[in-house]
Amino acid sequence: MNADVFEAVCAMGDAARTAQSQLAQANTEAKNQLLNAIADALDQHADDIAAANTLDMNKAETDGMDAGKLDRLKFDQQRITAAAQGVRHVASLPDPIGEIVRGYHLENGLRLQQVRVPIGVLGMIYEARPNVTVDVASLCIKSGNAVLLRGGHAAEHTNAATLAVIADVLTKHGYDHNMIATVDQYGRDGATAMMEARGHIDVLIPRGGAGLIQAVVRNSKVPVIETGAGNVHIYVDRTGNPDKAIPILINAKTQRVGVCNATEKLLVHKDIAESFLPKAAAALAAAGVEMHADERAYGIIEHAGIANAQLVHATDEDWDTEYLALKIGIKVVDSLDEAIAHINRHSTGHTESIIAEDYSAIEEFTARIDSAVVMVNASTRFTDGGVFGFGAELGISTQKMHARGPMGLHEMTTTKWIGYGTGQVRE
C-alpha cells in the first residue's frame, strides 16, 4: 500500500470526524431541510448526472461488463428521480438519534437511560452501484454520521457528478462538505487504506460481489459489517399453490437478475415435482433462464419436452453459486427437513422463501431457516430497504452482530448509557 495514500485517507477520516461533530449538533428539522435540499438539487442536476453515467456505461459496455452489472451501473433520469424521492422519504422518517431504547431507576434513585447515538465515521466500499452514493449520503445525514466512500472505477464519473451536487448543497447550507467524501481518486490503494485506517474510520461496510466482500472481511483492521452475496432460495412445499409459485418464481429470478435478492435456487418437494416442474420449467425457459437441474429435476423437465440448450445437469458447484444472471439451480427434495438442511448448508444467509399452504410447514421453515429474511408466499425481491420503508439502505447484512437484514437508519446508530443522579455515590 502507498504510504502517502494511507496518510491522506487517515487525514480524510479525521476531517470527516470533525465534520461529523458539527452534524451531530443539528436538530431533526435542520437535517430534514438539508435532505430535501439535496433531493431538489439531484432533480435539478439530473441531466448532468445522467450524462456522466452515460460515459461510465459506454466504457463498461466497451470493456465487456456483463448485463447484471450494467443494470446496477445504470443511473438514468428515472433512477435519479427515484433516488431523489428516496432522499425525501428518509427526511420524512422519524429521527433515531436521541431515541430512548430503555430506561429504569436503580434502588438508590439513579435513573439510567440507553439512548441512540451516531456511530461516527463510516467507510463504504462498493462497486458499480451509483445509487448507493445517494442512499448512503441521505442515511448518514439523517443519522448524524460522516462517511468516506470508495465507489469504484466503473462508476467514477457518475459518483463524481453526484457527490459534487451533494457537496455544493452542504456548503450552501453551512455544513462541512468533508462529512461525505470519496477516496476514488486513490484507486484501489484508497480502498486498502480504508481497511487499514482503524481509529480514523469506525466501521467499514462493503457492498458488492462475494469477492469484494470477502476481501474486505479478511483484510480489514477496521470493524466490518458484512453485507452478503445472495445465494437465495425458493422452496415449493408439497402444499404449495402453483398459481402463486410460478409468478413468484419468475419475478424473483428475472425482474432484475444482477441484484442480491434475486432467486438463484429452486427446491421442489418430490410430491409436487411431477406436476409443478414442467410448468415452472416452461415459464423459466420462456423467460430465457438456463436451468441447472439435479438428476431428478432434469429427468422430469426433459420428459416434459423442455430439453434444450436451456437445460443442463447441475454440478456440486452450482449449489454454492450466486449466478447474477439468467440461470437457476433446481433440485427435488424428499422432505421439508431436506430442504431446510440444504438451504442452511448452501445459503449465504440473505433471503429464502417458502411457497406453502400448510401452516405447520410454514412455521417450521421460518423458525429453522438461518437467514436474515424469510418470505412466505412472496418474492425474494422484497428484501430491500426501500421496500421495507427505510427510504434507502446501506446494504443487506447477512451477519448476526450489530445489524442483520436491510440496514436503514437504526442500523447506522449505536447506543450509550446516561445516568441521572442526585449526588449518589457507590457504596
From Swiss-Prot:
**Catalytic function, reaction form:** L-glutamate 5-semialdehyde + phosphate + NADP(+) = L-glutamyl 5-phosphate + NADPH + H(+)
**Oxidoreductase recorded as keyword:** yes
GO BP of this protein: L-proline biosynthetic process
CDD domains in UniProt? ALDH_F18-19_ProA-GPR
Q: What class of enzyme is it?
A: oxidoreductase
Report the Gene3D superfamilies cross-referenced here. Answer: Aldehyde Dehydrogenase, Chain A, domain 1, Aldehyde Dehydrogenase, Chain A, domain 2
Location in the cell: Cytoplasm
Q: Name one GO molecular function term.
A: glutamate-5-semialdehyde dehydrogenase activity
Record-listed E.C. numbers: 1.2.1.41
Q: What cellular component terms from Gene Ontology apply here?
A: cytoplasm
- rRNA processing found in the keyword field: no
Pathway assignment reads: Amino-acid biosynthesis; L-proline biosynthesis; L-glutamate 5-semialdehyde from L-glutamate: step 2/2
Name the keywords, alphabetized: Amino-acid biosynthesis, Cytoplasm, NADP, Oxidoreductase, Proline biosynthesis
Per the record, the major location class is cytoplasm
The protein's matches in NCBIfam families, at most eight in alphabetical order, are given as:
PRK00197.1, proA
The family annotation for this protein states:
Belongs to the gamma-glutamyl phosphate reductase family.
Q: What does this protein do?
A: Catalyzes the NADPH-dependent reduction of L-glutamate 5-phosphate into L-glutamate 5-semialdehyde and phosphate. The product spontaneously undergoes cyclization to form 1-pyrroline-5-carboxylate.
What protein am I looking at? Answer: Gamma-glutamyl phosphate reductase
